[in-house]
Amino acid sequence: MEKLYKENEGKPENERNLESEGKPEDEGSTEDEGKSDEEEKPDMEGKTECEGKREDEGEPGDEGQLEDEGNQEKQGKSEGEDKPQSEGKPASQAKPESQPRAAEKRPAEDYVPRKAKRKTDRGTDDSPKDSQEDLQERHLSSEEMMRECGDVSRAQEELRKKQKMGGFHWMQRDVQDPFAPRGQRGVRGVRGGGRGQKDLEDVPYV
């Protein structure tokens, strides 16, 4: 379908329909009128023509099935362009007759609720998976955020402790090494107390 859309991108829709299905102009005009009514409705709802067509293609009921068949015929013709056009005419002649019936069956008032209903159906079908995935992603992301925050806070606390305690300990060790043990020895009367005092006297004050 994308290939067909790309090939026919530059052409107006009326020409696309006539060329792809190979119908006479009278039949094409009836179909174009039916399509223009359908295309105006999605535009009124603020949708582009492409979205309107895609939703119309997937629509349940007679019209959706017929359009799917028409799309298959288009694909078959685009793949094998050597086929004569007479093969596609019987199905294409039946198509415009059934389209007015479908248009009569559902007036413009019914069109909008069906679309809305189909949207909600799509939403309910897709929403459990999507919502679960979204919840899992959100949950994972929140867990990751908590872990990262926890890791960052722990790292900051450890850095603070190291800066406060570690730096202070190193300062104490530097201070304690020359002075404290000797002073303690001298005070306690442990052997070598005199040596410590001698060493203190021998060391020049800087």
Curated annotation (Swiss-Prot):
Coiled coil: none annotated. It is found in: Nucleus. Residues 27-42, 57-70 have a biased composition (Acidic residues). GO terms for cellular component: nucleus. Pfam families: BEX (PF04538). Residues 1-26, 43-56, 71-86, 102-113, 121-160, 196-206 have a biased composition (Basic and acidic residues). Residues 1-206 are annotated as: Disordered. Keywords: Nucleus, Transcription, Transcription regulation. May be involved in transcriptional regulation. Belongs to the TFS-II family. TFA subfamily. This is Transcription elongation factor A protein-like 5. The lineage of its organism: Eukaryota, Metazoa, Chordata, Craniata, Vertebrata.
